[in-house]
Amino acid sequence: MGKIYIFAIGGTGANVMRSILMLMASGAFPQKEIIPILIDLDENNGNKNQTLSLLSSYSQIQNECHGLINNQSGVFNSKLVDINNNGWEIAECSTLLYRKKYIDILEYNELIFDRYKYKKLIDSLFGYNEEHYDAIHSFFPKVDAQLARVAFDYSLSGNSIFEKIEMSANPDDMIIIIGSTFGATGKAGICEVLNEFKNRQLLQHLYKAVVLVEPYFEVDKHKYGEPFYYSSTNFIDYYHRIYSNSVNQTFQIKTQKSQYYPYHAGGVEQINPAHSATFRAALTVMSIVDNDGRENEIDFDNSEDCSIDVLYRYGLGDIAMNLSYFAVSCYIWQKMNQDFFYREVYNSLKLYDKLKNNTYVAFDRFVNEYNTWCNEMSKSNIHLFDFNATSLNELIIGKKYIPHGLISLFRGNLLKIYKDEMYRSFREFYTDTHVSNYPAEEMFFKIINSASMRVANEIINS
């Protein structure tokens, strides 16, 4: 079974990786070895830091409950691998660029040719403001990919991450690169990462796919200007002319731009919410992996933006059940925290001390992030599907309809059903000699997974 390297570039790449993690937690990518690599010139990018925190929570849960990885299905059963052994980010990118201006990287005063002539040329292309802009910022109108590529080349050259991939590469490994076509980091990063793979003979044979996320929101034109969209179109044309032949497949995520986001050049304020476009990109990655790179082009046109059927029509409906299991788990988990019915479970497994200090905290944090992610999706004006009672209900049961929606079941008998199933699962696991030898944290998640699946099946068969 090959390893899946996911290069998430810039804020959009990190945002897509966030959705991928939600899918992983719900049971997608079963038994796959996922190696996320976040690349961003901006050390304080909000989306990147949000995803790094989520990766940390997932990893902590996985480390405590490693046995779940061997299951054929269930929550948190994808193996998350930290190739750096100290975080999922190529830290050198932002570290090397700290307190540097683009002009420092260009070093055009040191050109060995006619210095005056080339100084004039560069000044005419970029101007004083762009040249003296902080190199760790990426979402800048005229700097765009030209200067960002110089910064990437400066920071990626000789980076050990590519040598590590070379040393451990297997023929069935996959490389998936995700980035936007509108931010300087995404455009520059995609090109420079592909250049790195081009220059490494041992990595030439690996399957490579690129997922391009096109503009899916509006920004204040007075602050950013028209080049936001023009540069995206120009980049896509450039990419297909120069790079598309060097990869196995390219996927373009298109959608209507109907939302306005505040303009931020970078830093902690650049944190865009989850959106159907970034979720589509995550589903595309899932489909690539599930089909071992044999997936045909997935084209969600604008007329299908509001159609729940899109998931099923493109063969992506299988994840619906996984999402429903995890959604039920997350909802009930929060309800359980207000209830003491499972005190016997805690006492028997001696979970009070362990979970409240370690796994409990990580899982609680992940559940809160999952709920935030769902809420952000529901506020998107363009929906692949709504994360509300009716459409979540449709996702779980296909075309069958439960009157008043899924949430009405939560408010009614579902919580009692879950309590009963939680207790029943606990008794089954705890009386099974083999299972009772599992570490307490691992047994805890096995119980949660078993009870969630039973409740979801109860909904389907009701």
Can you say where each PLM-predicted feature lies in the sequence?
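Gly/Ser/Thr-rich loops at beta-strand to alpha-helix junctions
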Residues: 9-15, 179-190
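Beta-strand elements within well-structured catalytic alpha/beta cores of enzymes
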Residues: 174-178
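Short Gly/Thr/Asp-enriched flexible loops that form oxyanion-binding sites at enzyme active sites
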Residues: 20-21, 185-197
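Terminal, contiguous helix-loop blocks that mediate binding/assembly
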Residues: 1-25, 29-173, 193, 202-462
